[in-house]
Structures are given as C-alpha cells and as structure tokens.
Amino acid sequence: MKEVKQLAGQTLIYGLGTIVPRFLHYAVLTPFYTRIFIDPGDYGIVTELYAWMVVLLVVLTYGMETGFFRFVQQKEDADKVYSTALISLLVSSVLFILFVNIFIEPVSAVMNYRNNYDYIRMFAGIVAIDAFTAIPFARLRKENRPLYFSAIKIINVIITLILVIFLLKI
C-alpha cells in the first residue's frame, strides 16, 4: 500500500509540474500576445513557431529519454548511460544550431520566414536547449525527485513569462 501512495503522490507532483507550467503559459501569454500583436499575422508567427518546436523536439531528442530509462536500470552503468545520453544530445543540439546558422537562408525559406533570421536563430537556440535538457529532467524522474523536477519546470515558465513580457514591452 505504501508504494501505491508514493506512486499517487509522485504522479500528482509530476502532473502539476507539467500542467501548471502549460496553464500559466496559456493563461498569461495568450491574452498578452493578443494585446501586443495587433496584427493577427504576428501572433500567427508565435503559434507557428510553437508547432515547429513540437516536431523538432521529437526529432532532436530521437527517443533518447526512452533509451535512457531502459538502460539506466542497470545500476553499475547508470552514470555511463547518463553521460552518454547527455553528450549525445549536447552534440546533436550544437550541430542543430550550427546547421540552422550555416543554412539560415534555406531554413528561413522552408519555414516561410525570409528576412526574419533573428526569429529563426532564437527559435533554434530555444529548441536546442529544450532538447538538451530532456535527459537531466529524465534523471530527476529516475531519481524520484518530483518536487525538484516540478519546481524547476514551474520556475522555468515563470522566468520565461517575465522575460517575454519584459522583452516585448521594450
């Protein structure tokens, strides 16, 4: 019974660490964006970049979280599995940023953002960081640290909200 209680508690905390940031992001930024971006096309850029982000995160993490959980179960190799997965995502994230910067013109053309290279570069950096952090967050889940996991997720969104509001108001 103790394990069931622990599972329920951790599920609740991990769930809050996932749902609260998404709710905050939606509840705060959606009204803010609709006031800031008078032209609906400008708000459409934000929405479209989020759609690209979802697809690219799947590609850039290439199932590494699943592989991490599968192989980290062998206690003697846990540190090696973690470092290998982390280095792999670091290398692919850096290569992604380099690729985007080297081929910025064709990438912006494919995404229909010609002459908006800054959008593409910032976007690539955000996607690369998100992909890279997948394994540290998976490690927190593996180590049964739901409060730390959720706190970092929520703090991350709060910082994002503050920066977005601050930077778009300038």
Describe every region a protein language model picked out.
Residues 4-5, 34-43, 56-90, 108, ...:
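Transmembrane-helix boundary and interhelical linker motifs in polytopic inner-membrane proteins
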Residues 5-65, 93-101, 126, 157-161:
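Signature of the first transmembrane helix
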Residues 15, 44-47, 86, 120, ...:
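Hydrophobic/aromatic positions within or immediately flanking transmembrane alpha-helices
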Residues 88-170:
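Hydrophobic transmembrane helix module of multi-pass membrane transport proteins
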